[in-house]
Regions:
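A short helix->loop->beta-strand "cap" motif at the edges of active sites that frequently abuts
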Residues: 45, 82-84, 109-112, 207-208
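C-terminal helix-rich "cap/oligomerization" subdomain common to oxidoreductases
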Residues: 62, 205, 255-289
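Predominantly a Rossmann-like dinucleotide-binding segment in NAD(P)-dependent oxidoreductases
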Residues: 119-185
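Beta-loop-alpha module in the N-terminal Rossmann-like domain of NAD(P)-dependent dehydrogenases
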Residues: 33, 42-102
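Hydrophobic residues in well-ordered beta-strands that form the structural core
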Residues: 8, 49, 88, 113-115
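Contiguous beta-strand/loop segments that form the cofactor/metal-binding neighborhood of enzyme cores
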Residues: 171-239, 254-260, 264
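N-terminal Rossmann-like dinucleotide-binding module
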Residues: 1-42, 289
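Rossmann-fold dehydrogenase core element
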Residues: 100-118, 134-140
């Protein structure tokens, strides 16, 4: 575990510990006290006081990277070059250029690299997508209120903003269902050089469309609606339905572990993450033009 991120405390530590094919070995943090508190329920795991020492540890096979967005590329590449497989938290990078550099590093190292889009591993979500017949329109929304001014999601240098944080989910699921978009229209409300709210209209071949909406200044909103030949399909909490009853984080960890142990392709290949970042880049550009 690279860093003592809150997502580790809330979901990923338990998922690794419960996985059938993985073991929680160590957490590196520049705040050893915080890391120690997080690892208290996992007495076999060690606190390591530098990221470099974690990457050099021969007992570590896989790095989970939940660092702030602007550090994804640097530390993912450093981990790959150190001979570690990497599960990198979403969004994969700051932009498509960074994503391509990460993918190139993975190829050069011969190690596995996957973006941690856990929602794609939830059995109910997979069943929802697989039962769709001839989808023609997707509406995906994800928003909440970021109240703490010190929240890194509100800091432009750290890759803050609604589009990268929660819009990455809306874009990912739209592309999962409809494929790659053509023309894109978008608008954003900018404050302190970050998008507090972004909305976009994505055009696909065959006159199919997707409406995506992401916000850091709204009441909780998380919905997915798909218009298809068989009718209108809706799913609430498509991105955060944890442990009901299966834990998508654990399923994601086990899937990545299977790829590592058996040298199988990862479920979400780097090419998919590059394509998602490319669409996010295009939405950002369209929203500010």
């Amino acid at each position: 575990m690279l860093g003592a991120a809150d997502i580790a405390r809330r979901a990923v530590l338990a998922a690794i510990a419960a996985s059938a094919n993985g073991r929680l070995v160590a957490m590196a943090s520049r705040s050893p006290e915080r890391a120690g508190a997080m690892l208290a329920p996992y007495p076999d795991a060690r606190v390591i006081e530098s990221y470099e020492a974690l990457l050099a540890d021969p007992k570590v096979d896989v790095i989970y990277n939940p660092l702030p967005n602007h550090l994804h590329k640097e530390w993912t590449i450093r981990a790959l070059e150190a001979g570690k497989h990497v599960l990198c938290e979403k969004p994969f990078a700051m932009n498509a250029v960074e994503a391509e550099e990460m993918a190139s590093a993975a190829k050069a190292s011969g190690k596995h690299l996957m973006e941690a889009f856990m929602y794609r591993f939830h059995p109910a979500m997979r069943a929802f997508v697989e039962q769709l017949r001839d989808p023609i329109h997707v509406e995906a929304s994800f928003g909440f209120t970021a109240k703490d001014p010190s929240d890194i999601r509100l800091q432009a240098p750290f890759g803050g903003g609604a589009l990268l944080d929660v819009g990455s989910y809306a874009v990912s699921v739209s592309r999962w269902i409809l494929g790659e978009p053509g023309e894109i229209f978008a608008r954003a409300r900018i404050e302190r050089d970050i998008d507090m709210t972004t909305s976009g209209l994505l055009m696909f071949d065959g006159d199919r469309t997707a409406s995506v909406w992401a916000s850091l200044e709204s009441p909780g909103a998380e919905n997915l609606t798909v218009v298809a030949a068989g009718g209108v399909h809706r799913r609430e909490r498509p991105f955060t339905a944890h442990r009901d009853p299966q834990d998508p984080y654990q399923l994601m960890v086990e899937s990545f572990g299977d790829s590592v142990l058996n040298d199988r392709p990862v479920a979400i290949p780097p090419a998919e993450s590059i394509a998602n970042m490319r669409t996010l880049d295009r939405i950002r550009e369209a929203s500010r033009s």
